[in-house]
């Protein structure tokens, strides 16, 4: 061989010195590195060079130097050992493990009870047993996540976020795989759907489609939204939350750890804040964050429910005589069709807050649209505490609200034209009756009605069997 190389003057790969060969092998993927073992004795020896496997351990398994130091194993044996355990998830493991690691690191000092509620990872045989029970294969990225943490204990607050209004509360727990399997759906409208989350207060769940059926794409994550205009219980529309489990989980975690979702009273609140949605008037700054509530919304009839959280803050550098009190609010509300509604009233949510240097006042309210999106803007009127006759307006920045992408139930798409027209007429009659009733109510009456609805809703939730029936949506009063 050497004689042939000397005669031809060619330089083969194996004739290269060790260092250049190791450099080349450092760019080779783990599969090709393993295959090098079968090419020649020399490549087989070089492919076991331990530093080559350090990169793969960090890339695929996120094993740190500190973790390695705590084990009496080389990088290569660590890679092989981990691969033998979770190798089937190698395309998902790094993204899922990073999301879990980042989430726990962020929540430990802020929501320690939530982190303590997480369960240990499930075993492969546990996941296999669930697949046998439901008769469907679980997505690999779902299985991968549950190998790390098998959901959480059904406690409040839930890991997947909360939302609170004066007469409504939601907190979603991440279900363990056995509880989820008990809620696996075989009925029409949600066939082959597995619940991911559950709220013990509202019965709300997010589902993942483990098979493509009834117009859903495989692995899609969604909120169910029963069609309230159809007589067919299988008519269930969907608000799409994620294309896959990985997309759904990692995007949620990114919103949490980036500070996009605020932590309020040891809970994650699913408000989205646009950094540009801030307005400053003099020493007062107003910022807004919003959230869509699927459990209080419907596609048929079109009723999209949003809540918004407003923060009013006076600069610490403001002079003491700039202290002021909010007198009234003015809103200009525009839907996607360009229809405008103007609302003016005293105070905010029944209060007349005093703002002084360094003080922050926050409140939550809600609104609804008959279109999938809309926006609000307006101003507050204040008077100075030391100069009560002097009033001024503070701008509220324009903030946009839009519901997630939704998909209409195939049961509605298969509906005949006569049946559809009849449903539309019934819905219009119901809407007219609701409008007539609401026109006779003043603000205090609305508040009383809200409290009664809340009490009734709690009783209804206690009576409802978990995962048994679609959520019956109740309309909260529109607040400004």
UniProtKB/Swiss-Prot annotation:
Biased composition (Acidic residues): 419-458
Gene Ontology molecular function: any one: ubiquitin-like ligase-substrate adaptor activity
Pathway assignment: Protein modification; protein ubiquitination
ApaG domain segment(s): 278-408
GO biological process, one term: response to lipopolysaccharide
Principal localisation: nucleus
F-box domain span: 10-56
Coiled-coil blocks: none
Function: Substrate recognition component of the SCF (SKP1-CUL1-F-box protein)-type E3 ubiquitin ligase complex, SCF(FBXO3), which mediates the ubiquitination and subsequent proteasomal degradation of target proteins. Mediates the ubiquitination of HIPK2 and probably that of EP300, leading to rapid degradation by the proteasome. In the presence of PML, HIPK2 ubiquitination still occurs, but degradation is prevented. PML, HIPK2 and FBXO3 may act synergically to activate p53/TP53-dependent transactivation.
Subunit field text: Part of a SCF (SKP1-cullin-F-box) protein ligase complex SCF(FBXO3) consisting of FBXO3, SKP1, CUL1 and RBX1. Interacts with PML, interaction is direct and takes place either alone or within the SCF complex.
PANTHER family: F-BOX ONLY PROTEIN 3 (PTHR46550:SF6)
Name of the protein this chain belongs to: F-box only protein 3
Species whose genome carries this gene: Mus musculus
């Amino acid at each position: 061989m050497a004689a042939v190389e000397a005669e031809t003057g060619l330089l083969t790969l194996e004739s290269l010195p060790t260092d250049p060969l190791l450099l080349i092998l450092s760019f080779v993927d783990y599969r090709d590195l393993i295959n090098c073992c079968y090419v020649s004795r020399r490549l087989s020896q070089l492919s076991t060079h331990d530093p080559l496997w350090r990169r793969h351990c960090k890339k695929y398994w996120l094993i740190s130097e500190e973790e390695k130091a705590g084990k009496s194993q080389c990088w290569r044996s660590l890679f092989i050992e981990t691969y033998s355990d979770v190798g089937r998830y190698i395309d998902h493991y790094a993204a899922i493990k990073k999301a879990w690691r980042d989430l726990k690191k962020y929540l430990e000092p802020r929501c320690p009870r939530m982190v303590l509620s997480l369960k240990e990872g499930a075993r492969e045989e546990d996941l296999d047993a669930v697949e046998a029970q439901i008769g469907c294969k679980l997505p690999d990225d779902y299985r991968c996540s549950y190998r790390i943490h098998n959901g959480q204990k059904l406690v409040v607050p839930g890991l997947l976020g909360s939302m609170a209004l004066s007469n409504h509360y939601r907190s979603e727990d991440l279900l363990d795989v056995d509880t989820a399997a008990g809620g696996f759906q075989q009925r029409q409208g949600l066939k082959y759907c597995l619940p991911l989350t559950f709220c013990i207060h509202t019965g709300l769940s997010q589902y993942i489609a483990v098979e493509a059926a009834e117009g859903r794409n495989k692995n899609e994550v969604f909120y169910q939204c029963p069609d309230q205009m159809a007589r067919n219980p299988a008519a269930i529309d969907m608000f799409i939350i994620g294309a896959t489990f990985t997309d759904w989980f990692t995007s949620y975690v990114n919103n949490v750890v980036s500070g996009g979702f605020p932590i309020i009273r040891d809970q994650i609140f699913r408000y989205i804040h646009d950094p540009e949605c801030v307005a400053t008037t003099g020493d007062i700054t107003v910022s807004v964050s919003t959230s869509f509530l699927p459990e209080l919304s419907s596609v048929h009839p079109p009723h999209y429910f949003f809540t918004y959280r407003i923060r009013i803050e006076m600069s610490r550098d403001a002079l003491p005589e700039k202290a002021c009190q909010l007198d009234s609010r003015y809103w200009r509300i525009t839907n996607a069709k360009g229809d405008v509604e103007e609302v003016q009233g005293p105070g905010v949510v029944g209060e007349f807050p005093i703002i002084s240097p360094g003080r922050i006042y926050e409140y939550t309210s809600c609104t609804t649209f008959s279109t999938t999106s809309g926006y609000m803007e307006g101003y507050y009127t204040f008077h100075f505490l030391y100069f009560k006759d002097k009033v001024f307006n503070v701008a509220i920045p324009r903030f946009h609200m839009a519901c997630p992408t939704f998909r209409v139930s195939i049961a509605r798409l298969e509906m005949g034209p006569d049946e559809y027209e009849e449903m539309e007429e019934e819905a219009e009659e119901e809407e007219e009756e609701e409008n007539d009733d609401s026109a006779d109510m003043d603000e205090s009456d609305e508040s009383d009605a809200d409290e009664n609805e809340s009490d009734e809703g709690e009783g209804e939730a206690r009576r409802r069997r978990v995962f048994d029936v679609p959520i019956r949506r109740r309309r909260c009063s529109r607040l400004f």
